């Protein structure tokens, strides 16, 4: 019995050695060694095998128990046809030949190091030009008048210098040279002190000393009427004034020439309506919003066909833009329909001191059908500075005519009315009394001889002729005073040393009293 147990134990040991030899053979084949048949295999006794031999040395028959009888054959020994020990389950065995490590096959160039070039200069990738690096651009702002007049290089300081100060003029320039030239030209014409350059860190927008604080005018606090509600802890902050520089005569002449010379080539976002003396812009979808704003300030727009997101008019005055948004959401059922803005406007008027009159616009909003652009033609541009007043009178007469035509329309909805802007649209119902009063108030303020910022006899004569055709009457204080001066001069029979002095045709704006069927 004891001999059988020893033989079984020896059989297991031999099977382990056989499996170990087979594993070495498979490793040698994987290594691709060509000396497999020449070199004898040097066997090293592993730690596990030494433990088996030591167990056999101390083996005693009393420690061996009989193996229980198995019901299934072939379960008492290892099957020699099935590999019970795979190479991945064994620790690597060191032999005379270096084993291949799988990591070598994952290295670039099969593990062969590639020497790097010592030359720093390379002609394959030339150095990039430093001109491609974008540097932040600094704008300069000139505040011409007011308590904080000067030249600033930061818009935050400029906005703080202009907020809460009515009548302050300011403009943006790209370089300090342009800003200095504009500031010197203004101070020379006004005969005032030269404006100083105020950097961002040195802007003092508050009194510098206690004495200046005492001499500064006191701040007027708002009087709050409390009816059961708590009074606010502080005064309301002044409204921010958006940066909208006034249009200059040079800007207007540039846009005027652009409209006269535009022939429709190379730009499908706009077309022009050409008349004998002026060309007006018609902007379509995807037009440049900045150009739309400049043309609007110049009074050179006839129609705007904006996109659904109204990106073309995003730089127009906020109240005009809000009126258009309300029209889309409240006045039409299908908010995806295209709309139009039809504008009738005057043009600006300048004097030596600067801008005298801003354009006054009458804007009609409606649902647009298919846009059929007219053919833009390159027109001859021979306008001179002396001709601007005549052109302003012509546009003023057309604006008055379009305003008087509103009286013939019985179904009008007033979307927005301001001092110099009226926005309206067609309505399915009759005009309500509130909208009628708003239109009449706007007509009384605009339809006068002072439409262009100064008393213009040609405008007065045009209003008088137009109103008389409708059976009304129109009177102007300036024209009556002029007639009285002429009559008094003709009645005087005394000697005359020379021609009588003539009054200046440019006077400050004064609203005349009118009486007519359209204008009360």
UniProtKB/Swiss-Prot annotation:
Keywords: Host cytoplasm, Translation regulation
UniProt cross-references to InterPro entries, sorted A to Z: Ribosomal_bL9/RNase_H1_N (IPR009027), RNase_H1_N (IPR011320), RNase_H1_N_sf (IPR037056)
GO CC term, one of those recorded: host cell cytoplasm
GO biological process: regulation of translation
Cell compartment(s), UniProt: Host cytoplasm
Note: The inclusion bodies are the site of viral DNA synthesis, virion assembly and accumulation in the infected cell.
Family from the record: Belongs to the caulimoviridae viroplasmin family.
Protein name (Swiss-Prot/TrEMBL): Transactivator/viroplasmin protein
């Amino acid at each position: 019995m004891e001999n059988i147990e020893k033989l079984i134990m020896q059989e297991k040991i031999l099977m382990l050695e056989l499996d170990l030899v087979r594993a070495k053979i498979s490793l040698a084949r994987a290594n691709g060694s060509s000396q497999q048949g020449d070199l004898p295999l040097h066997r090293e006794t592993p730690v596990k095998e030494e433990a088996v031999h030591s167990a056999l040395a101390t083996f005693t028959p009393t420690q061996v128990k009989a193996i229980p009888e198995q019901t299934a054959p072939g379960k008492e020994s290892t099957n020699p046809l099935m590999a019970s020990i795979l190479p991945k389950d064994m620790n690597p065995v060191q032999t005379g030949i270096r084993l291949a490590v799988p990591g070598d096959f994952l290295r670039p160039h099969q593990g062969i190091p590639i020497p790097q070039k010592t030359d720093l200069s390379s002609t394959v990738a030339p150095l990039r030009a430093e001109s491609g690096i974008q540097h932040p651009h600094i704008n300069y702002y000139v505040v011409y008048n007011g308590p904080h007049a000067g030249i600033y290089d930061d818009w935050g300081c400029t906005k703080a210098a202009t907020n809460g100060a009515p009548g302050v003029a300011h403009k943006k320039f790209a370089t300090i040279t342009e800003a200095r030239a504009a500031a010197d030209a203004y101070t020379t014409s006004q005969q005032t002190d030269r404006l100083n350059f105020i950097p961002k860190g040195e802007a003092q927008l508050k009194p510098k000393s206690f004495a200046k604080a005492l001499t500064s005018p006191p701040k007027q606090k708002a009087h709050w009427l409390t009816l059961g509600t708590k009074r606010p802890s502080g005064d309301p902050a002044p409204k921010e004034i958006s940066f909208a520089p006034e249009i200059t005569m040079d800007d207007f002449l540039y846009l005027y020439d652009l409209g006269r010379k535009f022939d429709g080539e190379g730009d499908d976002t706009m077309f022009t309506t050409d008349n004998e003396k002026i060309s007006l812009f018609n902007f379509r979808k995807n037009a440049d919003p900045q150009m739309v704003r400049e043309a609007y300030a110049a009074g050179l727009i006839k129609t705007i066909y904006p996109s659904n997101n109204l990106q073309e008019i995003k730089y127009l005055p906020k109240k005009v833009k809000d009126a258009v948004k309300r029209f889309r959401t409240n006045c039409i059922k299908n908010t995806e329909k295209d709309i139009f803005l039809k504008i009738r406007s005057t043009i600006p008027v300048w004097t030596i001191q600067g801008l005298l009159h801003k354009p006054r616009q009458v804007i009609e909003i409606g649902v647009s059908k298919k846009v059929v652009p007219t053919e833009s033609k390159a027109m001859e541009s021979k306008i001179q500075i002396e001709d601007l007043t005549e052109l302003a009178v012509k546009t003023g007469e057309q604006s008055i005519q379009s305003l008087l035509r509103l009286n013939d329309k019985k179904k009008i909805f007033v979307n927005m009315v301001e001092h110099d802007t009226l926005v309206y649209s067609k309505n399915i119902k009759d005009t309500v009394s509130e909208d009628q009063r708003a239109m009449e108030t706007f007509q009384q303020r605009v339809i006068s001889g002072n439409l262009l910022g100064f008393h213009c006899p040609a405008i007065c004569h045009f209003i008088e002729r137009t109103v008389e055709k409708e059976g009304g009457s129109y009177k102007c204080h300036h024209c009556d005073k002029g007639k009285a001066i002429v009559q008094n001069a003709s009645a005087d029979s005394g000697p005359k040393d020379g021609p009588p002095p003539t009054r200046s045709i440019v006077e400050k704006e004064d609203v005349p009293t009118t009486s007519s069927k359209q204008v009360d």
